[in-house]
Amino acid sequence: MALTLLIGGARSGKSSLAVDIGHRHHAAGIPVTYIATAPCVDSGDDADMADRIERHRMERPATWATIEEELDLIGALSSVDDGLAIIDCLTLWTSNLMWRELGDDEIRTLATAAAAGAAGRSEPTVAITNEVGLGVHPETELGRRYRDV
């Protein structure tokens, strides 16, 4: 079925567009599952991220299913039986894997499997990711590795 990739800069409206797509599917009677990859943070640890997560939660109707999964994107995606799956976002998922000290090849293998799983669904999938390669050259080795993965 259809796999749609929403790509853009940080805070460029990608998640809002995905939610709009979800609303259209929901209005047509199609179930919507939102797969959130952002780690749940305490507002004391990162108030900005906690606020963003809460805003995203408020944008989604209670009738949508939500799966909060930082690492096992393939398992989360395979648990969505029917309807639209929205993955928000691949950028955070990748950084979550890097913080778990997975190697680049292992991350690429997981990304390939996740893409195949999304493309192989009989229902539509919308995946969100940030564009990280058109900006300035990252100053740190970790930043360059992140961009390259």
Whereabouts are the PLM-identified features?
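Helix-adjacent hinge/juxtasegments
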Residues: 58-107
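Conserved P-loop
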Residues: 2-79
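Generic beta-sheet signal
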Residues: 2-6, 32, 83-89, 125-127
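Conserved nucleotide-binding/hydrolysis micro-motifs of P-loop NTPases
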Residues: 39-42, 91-92, 132-134
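Glycine-centered flexibility motif
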Residues: 8-9, 83, 133, 137
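Residues at secondary-structure transition points
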Residues: 12-13, 41-47, 51, 85, ...
